[in-house]
Amino acid sequence: MATDSWALAVDEQEAAVKSMSSLQIKEEKVKADTNGVIKTSTTAEKTEEEEKEDRAAQSLLNKLIRSNLVDNTNQVEVLQRDPSSPLYSVKSFEELRLKPQLLQGVYAMGFNRPSKIQENALPMMLAEPPQNLIAQSQSGTGKTAAFVLAMLSRVEPADRYPQCLCLSPTYELALQTGKVIEQMGKFHPELKLAYAVRGNKLERGQKVSEQIVIGTPGTVLDWCSKLKFIDPKKIKVFVLDEADVMIATQGHQDQSIRIQRMLPRNCQMLLFSATFEDSVWKFAQKVVPDPNIIKLKREEETLDTIKQYYVLCNNREEKFQALCNLYGAITIAQAMIFCHTRKTASWLAAELSKEGHQVALLSGEMMVEQRAAVIERFREGKEKVLVTTNVCARGIDVEQVSVVINFDLPVDKDGNPDNETYLHRIGRTGRFGKRGLAVNMVDSKHSMNILNRIQEHFNKKIERLDTDDLDEIEKIAN
């Protein structure tokens, strides 16, 4: 299946989609009537479990819809544990001196040269003696294949006991990584993989003979300590994948730390996360001693190729009218429209359909595979407008989006501007050197305040646009 790695056959993708139908997205619990005006109640806040499932499901969705590697323009920043040691990067897999069966496996996956993150990460991960690594890496950058390569490089196939341990936040994400291991290791028939996930029962007293174990923290901890199916002292490589998803569940964080403490001192520790908020950093530093660090440089996240505007309105009907005026005046190839709640998203999609637009709706209650199908249709241009809530659209890349509309401005759970989400939303439009257009709908003093704070944060002026003035709208399209 397409993990965040290589172009694989479409039928494999479809098979994986079918196998994933059990994972559902939880309903957004935070409601807002107008931009950023949030009403919470004791029952309206997301539980940690729901938040984690949102992130885990989002990550899974990215894997299902990813057909190739993302061309990441961010500069990679490398912080070495030992600054005096030479810094290597590679431009080909041959330079890594892999075992022939492993190189064969890499090429069989359709991978011809390392991605940007792999160029820097692989020499560190394959170094002798082994080095620890904390890496920031988005979906689609080839990090799964990178750590699978590291695990397969260190395994002794003749030794029939677990030597590599990989933690994933959910059963479904563990399966995705497992598929990459099976594909890359297919010319190593003696290499075996075990899944340490709930429901996979072994007899008491039994020992795991597979060399690689991938699983969720709770089950892996049981297998290592209580049930003693695995001897943690023999583990050579420990991978903690999707750390930001993992720590959204308190239990997973504690379990991961307990597993790490059972491992030998010379075990190689590799941790990956798409984001590095403070909580992720603290966790990473607890589980990965003396690490090399690979980060994406923040200043690369530029808004220079995107023209940003705001429109003043009094209510959602006026916002809708402004939207119609935009559509009437300029040619929009494809647009993404973000709403704060599912209710608003559903209403807006229905209104746009009545106006004759081909509209796709990404909604929180959809199964992951349904959402993957909606995104594919939008990618193929079958629908020209995608209306979505924030929860659904994190991390989804569609190259031909020319306009992003914030029907509601992004705010965090406390009602403050969510700058990272703003950047992420509008960053979909100014890609690959093209000019993009972002339009923000403002309908209250509060949302004007949010907009002003977003301007200050990015140090970029957002111009006012009068959508009743056709000449003015036509100017912004040029």
UniProtKB/Swiss-Prot annotation:
A motif (Q motif) lies at residues 91-119. There is a cross-link at residue 26 (Glycyl lysine isopeptide (Lys-Gly) (interchain with G-Cter in SUMO1)). Residues 2-299 are annotated as: N-terminal lobe. SUPFAM superfamilies: P-loop containing nucleoside triphosphate hydrolases. One of its GO terms (biological process) is positive regulation of apoptotic process. Its EC number is 3.6.4.13. Keywords: Acetylation, ATP-binding, Cytoplasm, Helicase, Hydrolase, Isopeptide bond, Nucleotide-binding, Nucleus, Phosphoprotein, RNA-binding, Ubl conjugation. A motif (DEAD box) lies at residues 241-244. It is found in: Cytoplasm; Nucleus, Nucleoplasm. One of its GO terms (cellular component) is nucleoplasm. Belongs to the DEAD box helicase family. DDX19/DBP5 subfamily. This is ATP-dependent RNA helicase DDX19A.
